[in-house]
Amino acid sequence: MTGEEVKEPKEQQEITEVKEQEPEISYNAIVLNGVGGYDKVKVEVKKGVPTLKSDEILVRVQACGLNFSDLLVRQGAFGKHHSLGTECAGVVEAIGDLVIDRKVGDKIIMLNIDGGLWTELVVTTVNRTFLMPDGMSFQEAAAISVNYTAAYVMIYDFANLRPSQSILIHMAAGGVGIAATQLCKLVHDVTIFGTASPSKHETIKENGVTYPIDYTTLDYAEEVRKIAPKGVDIVLDPLGGADDSKGFGLLKPLGKLVLYGSANQVTAPKRSSLAAAKVWWHKFNIDALQLINSNKAVCGFHLGRTDPDHVAEVIRKLISLYKEGKIKPKVDSVWSFEQVGDAMRHMRNTRTLEKSSWSLKSRQLMPQLEIKSVSKRQG
């Protein structure tokens, strides 16, 4: 060969030019770099399209729910291998060849107790998704699966709420508290006691609480006894420590105490050994004979330990209730991905659970994706 320039075929030049013009796909994901304070939560830019199997779907996330459990995950309460984000809502971007009951463009609710949903693109299986009903916003959709499912199981499965009974809902202005109140109102003539700071009393009354109680300056047990000397039929307790014993003491015979959290441990951005020790020191203990003699029941609830098929059944019931106008998720505020630390700080500073439902709003500026490894179905 001489020193003459070797030219590429015209077809090869065109392919090269097209490749150079293709935008690089990237998306944001919130990750946990260790456990501890707010500095451990970071926004990372991921490059490329997530791999999709034939039985999976790719979802472009529009909103993510922030729950109290995410604060505990950040603090390391569940170990070092848990991921943030258990619920979100978005639009189906692509589907695998074997998927027949979802299509591109479907708006869906997504739940994954193992976390990992705080990302703009997520791959999941169909059984973890539920079609959004007409009229539901993405923020509402990202606020229904955890709080309302937890409240539904505790009230109807564990406590078996019946007409003319009474219930104490701690942190009634919180995500679970709002959901529990609305679900209690579906049963005839239920008396609802709800604890909240004074600034939230009007809100929880509008939501259905019969008797708001200021837990910040008053003894809530004494306040309940003033109105219901015999106590209440049900106590929903997310607090832990001494409040568990207090709640048990408030029960009528045949009453039920449902424990589902330990909010008293979250007193600072980082996990507090002192707070944990205080909760442990005041932990609720009762033996079988004492329980029999008390004529009461104690239940412990963990959404992650609930049968997935039952969870799916409950979510479908909740969607039906939403369609009927019987429940309505309340979104307190919307934050961008970059504000995740501020959102967590705000949740803790406003008495942790004392929120409605939160959303982390993802950006909507990503280019349209072209997924060639799976079939897209527009039907």
UniProtKB/Swiss-Prot annotation:
Name listed for the protein in its UniProt record: Synaptic vesicle membrane protein VAT-1
Biological processes per GO annotation: negative regulation of mitochondrial fusion
Superkingdom of the organism of origin: Eukaryota
Molecular function via GO: oxidoreductase activity; zinc ion binding
Further details from the record: Synthesized in the neuronal cell bodies and transported to the terminals. Each vesicle contains approximately 28 molecules of VAT-1.
Function: May play a central role in the functions mediated by specific classes of synaptic vesicles.
InterPro entries named among the record's database cross-references: ADH-like_N, GroES-like_sf, NAD(P)-bd_dom_sf, PKS_ER, Quin_OxRdtase/zeta-crystal_CS, SV-ATPase_mito-regulator
One Gene Ontology term, aspect cellular component: synaptic vesicle membrane
Coiled coil: none
Family named by the database record: Belongs to the zinc-containing alcohol dehydrogenase family. Quinone oxidoreductase subfamily.
Location(s) in or outside the cell: Cytoplasmic vesicle, Secretory vesicle, Synaptic vesicle membrane
Pfam families: ADH_N, ADH_zinc_N_2
Tissue: Cholinergic synaptic vesicles.
Oxidoreductase in keyword set: yes
